[in-house]
Amino acid sequence: MPEISIIVPVYNVEQYLPAALDSLRAQTCPDWEAILVDDGSPDGCGALCDAAARQDARFRVIHQKNAGVGAARNAGLAAARGTYVQFLDSDDALEPQMVEVLCRTAKQTDADLIMFGGYEEHYAADGTRTGCTDIAPVLEGVYRGDPCPQLFPQLSAMSLVTRQLFRRRC
């Protein structure tokens, strides 16, 4: 059983999907599975997903009729085998150590939920990187019991499902 199941809903992102898949392949921790849910994408995404699964057994593919991102995530959850679950949007990419750091942190803290920040890269029309913006402040620490009211503004900034790791329970 993999430590982390990474669920990737896929729809009409043919130009971005290769970077997301490459970021998964580049992970320093090999103990993951990626569940690619092709949500009836009209472009070449289904073929890209199938090719990834043929090349690397850690990728699994679900093809379904278009039902929206929520249904795609739920289909991925139903197929997940990992101790933990993470969602990755198909036009995003993970830093190479992301899975390793999340896995280590989850084990060390016995966390049911880890929330983390991220950043957005900006590019000019010619593809030149022009900058980077922190899109969620990083809140470090282990919090147990009732959350402190002063944490709410920071927690709401990190409330995107793609900025969290969840313990999956059967």
Language model segments and positions:
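Nucleotide-sugar donor-binding/catalytic module of glycosyltransferases
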Residues: 1-170
